[in-house]
Curated annotation (Swiss-Prot):
It comes from Hepatitis B virus genotype A3 (isolate Cameroon/CMR711/1994) (HBV-A). Terminal protein domain (TP) is hepadnavirus-specific. Spacer domain is highly variable and separates the TP and RT domains. Polymerase/reverse-transcriptase domain (RT) and ribonuclease H domain (RH) are similar to retrovirus reverse transcriptase/RNase H. The polymerase/reverse transcriptase (RT) and ribonuclease H (RH) domains are structured in five subdomains: finger, palm, thumb, connection and RNase H. Within the palm subdomain, the 'primer grip' region is thought to be involved in the positioning of the primer terminus for accommodating the incoming nucleotide. The RH domain stabilizes the association of RT with primer-template. HAMAP family: HBV_DPOL. Multifunctional enzyme that converts the viral RNA genome into dsDNA in viral cytoplasmic capsids. This enzyme displays a DNA polymerase activity that can copy either DNA or RNA templates, and a ribonuclease H (RNase H) activity that cleaves the RNA strand of RNA-DNA heteroduplexes in a partially processive 3'- to 5'-endonucleasic mode. Neo-synthesized pregenomic RNA (pgRNA) are encapsidated together with the P protein, and reverse-transcribed inside the nucleocapsid. The record marks Y65 as: Priming of reverse-transcription by covalently linking the first nucleotide of the (-)DNA. Residues 180-348 are annotated as: Spacer. This is Protein P.
Amino acid sequence: MPLSYQHFRKLLLLDDGTEVGPLEEELPRLADEDLNRRVAEDLNLGNLNVSIPWTHKVGNFTGLYSSTVPIFNQEWQTPSFPKIHLHEDIINRCQQFVGPLNVNEKRRLKLIMPARFYPNSTKYLPLDKGIKPYYPGHVVNHYFQARHYLHTLWKAGILYKRETTRSASFCGSPYSWEQELHHGRSVTKTSQRHGDESFCSQPSGILSRSSVGPCIRSQLKQPRLGLQPHQGPLATSQSGRSGSIWARVHPSTRRSSGVEPSGSGHIDYSASSSSSCLHQSAVRKTAYSHLSTSKRQSSSGHAVEFHKVPPNSARSQSQGPVFSCWWLQFRNSQPCSEYCLSHLVNLLEDWGPCADHGEHHIRIPRTPARVTGGVFLVDKNPHNTAESRLVVDFSQFSRGSTRVSWPKFAVPNLQSLTNLLSSNLSWLSLDVSAAFYHIPLHPAAMPHLLIGSSGLSRYVARLSSNSRIHNHQYGTLQNLHDSCSRQLYVSLMLLYKTYGRKLHLYSHPIILGFRKIPMGVGLSPFLLAQFTSAICSVVRRAFPHCLAFSYMDDVVLGAKSVQHLESLYTAVTNFLLSLGIHLNPNKTKRWGYSLNFMGYIIGSWGSLPQDHIVQKLKHCFRKLPVNRPIDWKVCQRIVGLLGFAAPFTQCGYPALMPLYACIQARQAFTFSPTYKAFLSKQYMNLYPVARQRPGLCQVFADATPTGWGLAIGHQRMRGTFVAPLPIHTAELLAACFARSRSGATLIGTDNSVVLSRKYTSFPWLLGCTANWILRGTSFVYVPSALNPADDPSRGRLGLYRPLLRLPYRPTTGRTSLYAVSPSVPSHLPDRVHFASPLHVAWRPP
């Protein structure tokens, strides 16, 4: 007869009311392999090979072979990004605020000023892969929305735009390392390899300064990077030298309007083997006529003023030689049908420039006209579907033999968090807007983190049925109109209402590199965690009576009273703003005395999962089918949810071990009614995880494979096992006996497995029961030689070792508390004293 739920509870000793024998007899039984096997068979836990078809969906959890169709929202708003500029002298500013920084804080702040990224190898992908065809039904809309998002990021100073192979432009305030690379500031060595005068960049991408003779100086003034107008004498003297960049480009391309490879003006790259890979001129717009008034430092140190190009030669680009640009070609062509794009292009006289250029130009290491990752848009988060979020896929750096092993960093575990944050403080949490985009990246990383798009014409051609990318006879009118279709015309007409003349700008190819850290690289979470933990450490030192703590971009502040918290909030906000950190004041949340953080509610009583997680648990058990094999992928998702709440249940993680085993074996799992009832009962009653208190250890446990011994104060006890047990199992049993005999929450043991409080590797029934008995117990390590319970466990009761005075201090784990806050008094004062922390600790920044 299968094991009923009541019997199973009795077996696990979970029922308080039932009469069971003494624990010393009952517990070792649960370690018996035979019993564990019989129970597993009864509960159908071990039977992984099933012939019935697997279930692939349980509630909201989907498993193998299921494809969730992403939903595209035509109304998505592109979020706005503030002009984020983290101040470069952040260390000095912190030191003015709080005095000298300690080593940990300095090291962390230096890591991010600027951040560096050097992958082992980088795979370059064609531009067509820049915007992923994630929404096959909304290709054009997705293209323009993604392109608009990229443009917004570039305008906000988050991206560099590749102008030529070796130069980039950006918006926003430049950092000092960018000013060193500013065009014309530093004179570069010329490498004489192959008679080429290309920039020789050092590994870091910073170009060396050196005093160069006047002859080279005069050559450097020539427009090698297209940053000066091509005027007669310079341009002609240039074409004689074979090595220079401009000599490689067909002379016809040297015009003042932008060069467009995907248009028809077929460019002949004489020196390059594959013309398809050189879209460089796409981003190498030689037209800098809009820069005509800006002054630039020349290499010789004199300011060179851009000469104004005579008005007739600098016609507005949209009226200039039209054959340079796919979009403007439609203006002079005969409409091919009522859905021809020429109808749209003729709506506007002036479509604006073909390319936008940033406020600043810098030199960069050689950057090919390629991308290294694709982008697509999704909902900003499950609660905000009105705004979009850009997903950047740089997964190439985490794959294959050349993958980058990302640095590891400490994530606070539940017990550490509770020890640290469980107190009766008032709490509020701050919202850092676009946290990742605060941290600047060195320009040398740009060639590895490239995103972009190949331009609308190629994008549409690639997705239409017969790919016309391979026939290079651009420019014939028939080819131009190949892309006209009703669908494209209707989409563009609707988009014209949204974007207006920007449609022209967005239809051009573009290559962008990251100037701030992107989210799709494993380095970014590490850097963000280092950054916010260092800042919080500074805040804790500045306000010693308060607590500041962060995990990634989630920053919380705690203070003893609401008034104190408000003044702290004002001071900290001003401090963070002075560093250039952007906070979103609308999203500041005041929590009162129970803080919501990282999915937990943390109050003076301890921590529990937040309510939405409790609701998910209830929903999960309502939908969980019985006696049907569930595919292991679904099990993985169920275990993810149950694992989060496991520390709050009686039996903890050990209860989930059968599920873990089936996931590891990649087999289906069948819930028997008893196992489901057991789990659901476990998760319906959640117990808070309390904070650990410091104290003196008075109770010690020790065991040998054949016997156990306890030292409780001056009392000694011993016992033997019926059969020899593995040593870890014996030690665990001894710890359980110590807890049940003495009721002490602090036990000394010399076994590392018991100390770790992970009971998942023990026999299943014993692990579940031991977790319940030892819940809330803290363990102190005591070396075997000093353990007072060592002798009793070996059967020697007469010998007395002196009782140790073992103090126990609860740990906050590796959560970076470099500045340890003084402990907060546990009671609230009846009234504010005049020596209140408001008057004493709060110094204006």
